[in-house]
């Protein structure tokens, strides 16, 4: 317990007081632009459903604004924590992630919405445990890659441990069920292990096995099989199985080049289900047109590119933990954004994943804010390390996190 409390303290002295002028403000402004645009679009997309459910058309806008404020405060707090604290706290976070995934499955604890038990009610907010667990698992895996870096390329046991951890996490996610998050988590793990030096043939074999397992899960579930077959031709059943996707495509088509205007969407008027959450991107395309779509895609592309560059800079500065953490978080956020937009446009089957930073939801917004604050912290420490003379390697060969 003493170790946990020591790790959780806000050690401003160790973080160097945080020189704000050294932060990557281009990345920070990109994040704020996405979150700000998301807030506007949530307010627009949720007007009808909010008025019908609560009598206040701006109900979800107010809540999302509060979530955004909490996310900003949590991000600032994380910026003051050194990466070494997260490196040492990786095992604790791993236990926390599994604890949350188990607790939500206990009858009477987890809240069921649309047939899925993914939330724990906490008063004003429903905690989506998968969002917290995913960040915890990525932090743990980044630390594991540092500790076992020399063994990952050639040792099967070093590769098997994270495989077992993430497979168990995927099983718990599928029990909710949350197929989309399980897919993103496993893809992130494979990508990070590859970047950490795991052999390509092991990654390839595991990828094929996971693809086979995913296929069996789809074939064995009538609901998932219907989603797969519907996505190939949603117009074959536009009023039942293909209803959501066809309404999304109609929204995107109505937007044309410059959109119908902010607030003027027709599809959000109870035609398009989940217009303010999973399918917010469709409403954005309808109201802001291709121009708005290009802007959002460009912002996410820059975020993903910059995240990978930060990881590379951290590795060059002899900060491997920061590098793996940056890569893992970037892959996770970038992949989720890509899947959400692809699903909205009918390029992938429906997964139930939100658009990071933009879709309505407190857990997703807060945890994404924390993840991006960690990315900024990686860049901050890499810049500090690059400006300092490198110490001589110790005889023990211990890798600095």
UniProtKB/Swiss-Prot annotation:
One Pfam match: FTSW_RODA_SPOVE
Periplasmic side: 48-65, 110-118, 176-180, 224-278, 344-354
Compartments in which it is found: Cell inner membrane
UniProt EC number: 2.4.99.28
Topology feature Cytoplasmic, residues: 1-26, 87-88, 140-154, 202, 300-322, 376-401
Bilayer topology annotation: Multi-pass membrane protein
Gene Ontology molecular functions: lipid-linked peptidoglycan transporter activity; peptidoglycan glycosyltransferase activity
Catalytic activity: [GlcNAc-(1->4)-Mur2Ac(oyl-L-Ala-gamma-D-Glu-L-Lys-D-Ala-D-Ala)](n)-di-trans,octa-cis-undecaprenyl diphosphate + beta-D-GlcNAc-(1->4)-Mur2Ac(oyl-L-Ala-gamma-D-Glu-L-Lys-D-Ala-D-Ala)-di-trans,octa-cis-undecaprenyl diphosphate = [GlcNAc-(1->4)-Mur2Ac(oyl-L-Ala-gamma-D-Glu-L-Lys-D-Ala-D-Ala)](n+1)-di-trans,octa-cis-undecaprenyl diphosphate + di-trans,octa-cis-undecaprenyl diphosphate + H(+)
Function text: Peptidoglycan polymerase that is essential for cell division.
Protein name, as recorded: Probable peptidoglycan glycosyltransferase FtsW
Organism: Alkalilimnicola ehrlichii (strain ATCC BAA-1101 / DSM 17681 / MLHE-1)
Gene: ftsW
